[in-house]
Amino acid sequence: MTTEGLVVPALSTQQDDSTFEFDKVCSKTVVRSHLGLPNDATDDQVIKRIREYYNISEICNFLKQKVEGHELDMIPKYKHVTLQFPDSLICDSASIVHELQRELGLMPRTEDSSEVKCSADSCCKTGKVESPLSQKLWILADTSYSSCCIDEVAAGHVNSDLVIHFGDACLNVVESLPAAYVFGKPSLKLDSVITQFKEIYANRDSKILIMADAPHTQSLNQLYNILKPEYPNLAYADLYLNPSSNASIIGYDPCPSQSSILNVLNRTIIGLDNGDIDTDIDTILLEHDLFHIEVPAVPRLLQLTTRFQSVTTFEPKSGLASQGPYPKLMRRYRYMHMARSAGTVGLLVNTLSLANTKTLINKIGQKIKEAGKKHYVFVVGKPNVAKLANFENIDIWCVLGCDHQGIIIDENNEYYKPIVTPYELLLALNKDQNWSGKWVTDFNKVLEDMSLEDERNKQEINDGSDNNEEDSDDEAPEFNPVTGQYVSTSKPLRKLHHLQISSQEQHPELDNEGSQDLVKKFSSAVAIKDTVSTSAMHLQTRHWTGLGSDFQQNDSDEEANNEDGALVEDGRAGIARGYDYDRETKFQ
């Protein structure tokens, strides 16, 4: 037998040099389309454009402010500064911070480590010492909630005393932290805008209002002056910053407001006739067609469609205009009716920075209790389908967030339960009030409506028109207006006289029973202390109700009902390389 045909068996899989090489990370080309630079732009050109786009010099002048009335004139007013960027502008964050540090002289100086004492601010391990008069900069990349709002939560982690917000912003009033807005200077081709504008609005006498997002609003004044001679009824919306807010805008000065009634949607209307100023602002807006530069977020777009006669959006990148389709208001009307038959409401907090958030939560909670419903407050960060799906016993969600991007509009029916706004929930709780077609998302407007309703109720009580005597009969049955089915848990906090559970004080013979029997009585009851227990009713509909429930047999098997559930035993403890029984075996 020859050995020529024999093959040595492989003791391992085939390996070559590529097996032991590190995986190569493909470098990504950063696309900065908002800067308007060619793809082959040099680093110097990019830095120069960034300084012009974000007004780096004006930001430095703003940060160079000193504390007034202090003994030392060199103490900076803002020592801990956080820079907040949206995802689309995070690519410029490192360059912006480097330019700010270079111009403000914030580069740390290095000293001999032997002369440095260990402390909280400086450590001998690094040998770097921060001057007590210097400033510190942090980058906030991942916002806690909506990117258009000031992120006070993330800024509080570094004890920030100023937040500089870059990009588009909602300009809503912040709770406490000072803020500054830097919108940037995006390029806008006015010729393309004018061409599309004239094609859509052939009638020169039409009442038209021009609006844009915060960065493109800086170009509206120039566009307005060009189109005004041909369109006499033309107006535009400039930015409006509430004087009560501790915020400022860097690089742009909005036009002053002509009248307080023209301040709406965080904008001030410019160019209206003097006769229209005395008219109700809602009536004025309904008479105008809106031409909006840049496509707003879905909540903002839905809000605009309810305030104007028609809405046209213009996309600056593509240069095309669109008149729909837009989010439908009928779905909001349907969700409002579903909220009327809901028994458990989940208040979903989607912001922690806006003013009056806590006040709105407390007042809405009180309204829910008065309506005989239950509510729970949830703070889960950025909401998504998976997070909200964990709470099955919630019948409907009420989201409290920014009116620009903080309101959840479920266009694709991804969420398992309907999501409404505070305004829609208040309409559902007050059955005597009909929906006029408006869609209100402003916190202050909702609080004003609640205050007016409370005043009317007090006036009715004083006039004696309110009857405080309770009817002896049960309340009228509640039906779901969408499905038509009877709903028995729409008001779980209402007083019941036909369903209740006995306590040990009322029946002392329960003391002789076992603790397990008492638990079973409470778990099977649907009413506790004269109110419906939605948790107990939801638990009864589940197949798995806890440990040992999978050992229970059918109700017809009397012997099986008396059997105990699974016994709880000590499990395996330790880590994978050495559990308890492994150690005992090793030492034996």
Curated annotation (Swiss-Prot):
Assembly, in brief, is: Component of the 2-(3-amino-3-carboxypropyl)histidine synthase complex composed of DPH1, DPH2, DPH3 and a NADH-dependent reductase, predominantly CBR1.
User: What name has this protein been given in UniProt?
Assistant: 2-(3-amino-3-carboxypropyl)histidine synthase subunit 2
Pathway(s) the chain acts in: Protein modification; peptidyl-diphthamide biosynthesis
Cell compartments where the protein resides: Cytoplasm
Which organism is this entry from? Answer: Debaryomyces hansenii (strain ATCC 36239 / CBS 767 / BCRC 21394 / JCM 1990 / NBRC 0083 / IGC 2968) (Yeast)
Q: Which GO terms describe its biological process?
A: protein histidyl modification to diphthamide
For bias type Basic and acidic residues, the affected ranges are 579-588
Per the entry, which co-factors are needed?
Answer: [4Fe-4S] cluster
- Glycosyltransferase among the record's keywords? no
Q: Give the record's family classification.
A: Belongs to the DPH1/DPH2 family. DPH2 subfamily.
Q: Which top-level group of life is the source organism from?
A: Eukaryota
Q: How is the cofactor bound?
A: Binds 1 [4Fe-4S] cluster per subunit. The cluster facilitates the reduction of the catalytic iron-sulfur cluster in the DPH1 subunit.
Alphabetically ordered keywords of this record: Cytoplasm, Iron, Iron-sulfur, Metal-binding
Instruction: Tell me the InterPro entries matching this sequence.
Output: DHP2, DPH1/DPH2, DPH1/DPH2_1, DPH1/DPH2_3
The job of this chain, per UniProt, is described as:
Required for the first step of diphthamide biosynthesis, a post-translational modification of histidine which occurs in elongation factor 2. DPH1 and DPH2 transfer a 3-amino-3-carboxypropyl (ACP) group from S-adenosyl-L-methionine (SAM) to a histidine residue, the reaction is assisted by a reduction system comprising DPH3 and a NADH-dependent reductase, predominantly CBR1. Facilitates the reduction of the catalytic iron-sulfur cluster found in the DPH1 subunit.
Q: Which Pfam families match?
A: Diphthamide_syn (PF01866)
Report residue spans for region: Disordered: 454-485, 546-588
MF GO annotations: 2-(3-amino-3-carboxypropyl)histidine synthase activity; 4 iron, 4 sulfur cluster binding; metal ion binding
Q: Main location per UniProt?
A: cytoplasm
Gene Ontology CC: one annotated term: 2-(3-amino-3-carboxypropyl)histidine synthase complex
Q: Where is the composition biased (Acidic residues)?
A: 466-477
Residues given in the record as [4Fe-4S] cluster binding sites = C149, C170, C402
